[in-house]
Amino acid sequence: MPPRALLLVDLQNDFCAGGALAVPEGDSTVDVANRLIDWCQSRGEAVIASQDWHPANHGSFASQHGVEPYTPGQLDGLPQTFWPDHCVQNSEGAQLHPLLHQKAIAAVFHKGENPLVDSYSAFFDNGRRQKTSLDDWLRDHEIDELIVMGLATDYCVKFTVLDALQLGYKVNVITDGCRGVNIQPQDSAHAFMEMSAAGATLYTLADWEETQG
């Protein structure tokens, strides 16, 4: 059986408590991530991560448009929520959470580097015009199944999962390892429904550990 990989989506300081774009309860994902890291390491399975990595003038930032954060608009001809400045390259906010077992992470894939378009997915920018190196890395390592968790459920996790499925990967989502922005109260619930409908299998961490042994 080809190996699996655990993909940790954007477990970065700016998405956790005190960060520029703090996701409610975002910190609670780190313990889940560390348990999954230990689980994967004990089975020889890869651990990888995505990292939002924006230039300071990124077009998704509300500050670049003179609008309030969370204002809807357009960027590169695509619908866009304008965010607080976050995950600026080489800033403290862009770093992976300090309590995350980072030494186990075999590769980190940057996204959102092009200032003209946002990139929620760890595979593509939002216009699907440019790929990150994630898909090539997975194929080079003959990985065809992913365990996905991270931040935020309703944006980067959702679009990463949907792209992975479209690329032909089997995808397992650890629901209690995810937290959402929830601009609308049901956004995360709808995101999980969308992922499931597209073919992802949803597990709690306890269910995953029980069913996978």
Curated annotation (Swiss-Prot):
GO terms for biological process: pyridine nucleotide salvage. One of its GO terms (molecular function) is hydrolase activity, acting on carbon-nitrogen (but not peptide) bonds, in linear amides. CDD domains: nicotinamidase. InterPro entries: Isochorismatase-like_dom, Isochorismatase-like_sf, Isochorismatase_Nicotinamidase. It is an enzyme of class 3 (hydrolase). The active site is at D10, K111, C156. Its EC number is 3.5.1.19, 3.5.1.-. Pathway: Cofactor biosynthesis; nicotinate biosynthesis; nicotinate from nicotinamide: step 1/1. SUPFAM superfamilies: Isochorismatase-like hydrolases. Catalyzes the deamidation of nicotinamide (NAM) into nicotinate. Likely functions in the cyclical salvage pathway for production of NAD from nicotinamide. NCBIfam families: PRK11609.1 (NF008623). Belongs to the isochorismatase family. This is Nicotinamidase. It comes from Escherichia coli (strain K12). The lineage of its organism: Bacteria, Pseudomonadati, Pseudomonadota, Gammaproteobacteria, Enterobacterales. The gene is pncA.
